[in-house]
């Protein structure tokens, strides 16, 4: 019986010293972000990406990257509008726009995904509903991550090309992000 009392006392001390209830009320534990939290953070927001290289237009004789500025608006239904301004490859400060393009897509946020960099992101299924080139753009299966005033998207890595849910992008570059526009 004496051993039982000692065990109960030790257990009580350990439980008390750890905070007891497990709630996050001021004990430094940050609650995990839910899907609805991510949707709320994205709804009715505007984002922009500063001047950066873009090489998806490279072909044949033209191998240089264009430089682009991208403005992204996301409405309450998670319809996203990308307005991309293209600048000559030598215009690294994006001073004189050559042309622009408009793409509209629909975001569908899925569950938690841990990236290759151990970042807790959400899956993003993006379906394009309009683009300026009238191209048939396949759905994009990627990642989405919000940290403070920065918005990150997944990127291709190995066999994870984002073509199907099974080959969803699995990497996030913290050097490649959109900044929230505060009105």
Regions found by a protein language model. Name each.
Residues 170-180:
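C-terminal partner/receptor-binding element of secreted or periplasmic proteins
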């Amino acid at each position: 019986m004496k051993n039982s009392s000692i065990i109960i006392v030790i257990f009580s001390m350990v439980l008390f010293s750890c905070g007891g209830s497990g709630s996050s009320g001021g004990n430094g534990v940050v609650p995990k972000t839910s899907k609805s939290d991510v949707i709320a953070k994205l709804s009715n927001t505007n984002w922009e990406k500063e001047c950066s290289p873009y090489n998806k237009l490279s072909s044949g004789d033209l191998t240089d990257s264009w430089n682009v500025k991208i403005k992204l608006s996301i409405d309450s239904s998670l319809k996203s509008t990308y307005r991309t301004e293209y600048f000559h490859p030598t215009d690294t400060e994006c001073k004189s726009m050559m042309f622009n393009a408009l793409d509209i897509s629909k975001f569908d946020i899925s569950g938690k995904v841990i990236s290759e960099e151990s970042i807790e992101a959400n899956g993003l299924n993006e379906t394009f509903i309009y683009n300026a080139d009238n191209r048939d753009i396949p759905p994009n299966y990627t990642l989405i991550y919000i940290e403070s005033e920065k918005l990150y998207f997944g990127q291709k890595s190995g066999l994870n090309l984002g073509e199907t849910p099974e080959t969803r992008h699995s990497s996030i570059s913290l050097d490649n992000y959109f900044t929230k526009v505060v009105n």
